[in-house]
């Protein structure tokens, strides 16, 4: 259920679907549905407001989970703004760090996109 909720909340656009096998044992699977919703809201705010190179840390209110999000690069991908970001998450028994690309859709929502260009 958490995997389905994660997919629905973070990867809502089916055109940008992600292979979830890489997230099966991810720290984010430890979050409750409400915490996952909160994390998504924080991530959207970070992508909207945080300058490149600035790390923002978020801690789940109940679950032992901490995530550090650092926007790295802002650019235009086609017609829409995109941002590469590093997300480092730790849920005590699980740790994951990756670089991800998000692009802003016409509806104003940031969506997970293709892997970032190096």
Regions found by a protein language model. Give the residues of each.
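Surface-exposed, charged secondary-structure patches
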Residues: 62-81
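N-terminal signal peptide c-region/cleavage motif recognized by signal peptidases
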Residues: 12-14
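Sec-dependent signal peptide recognition
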Residues: 1-8
């Amino acid at each position: 259920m958490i995997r389905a909720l994660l997919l629905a909340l973070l990867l809502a656009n089916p055109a940008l679907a992600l292979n979830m096998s890489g997230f099966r044992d991810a720290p984010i699977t430890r979050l409750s549905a409400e915490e996952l919703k909160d994390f998504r809201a924080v991530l959207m705010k970070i992508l909207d407001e945080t300058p490149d190179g600035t790390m923002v840390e978020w801690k789940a209110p109940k679950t032992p989970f901490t995530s550090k999000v650092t926007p790295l690069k802002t650019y235009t991908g086609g017609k829409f703004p995109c941002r590469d970001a590093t997300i480092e998450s730790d849920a005590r028994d699980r740790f994951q760090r990756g670089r991800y690309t998000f692009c802003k859709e016409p509806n104003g929502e940031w969506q997970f996109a293709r892997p970032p260009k190096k």
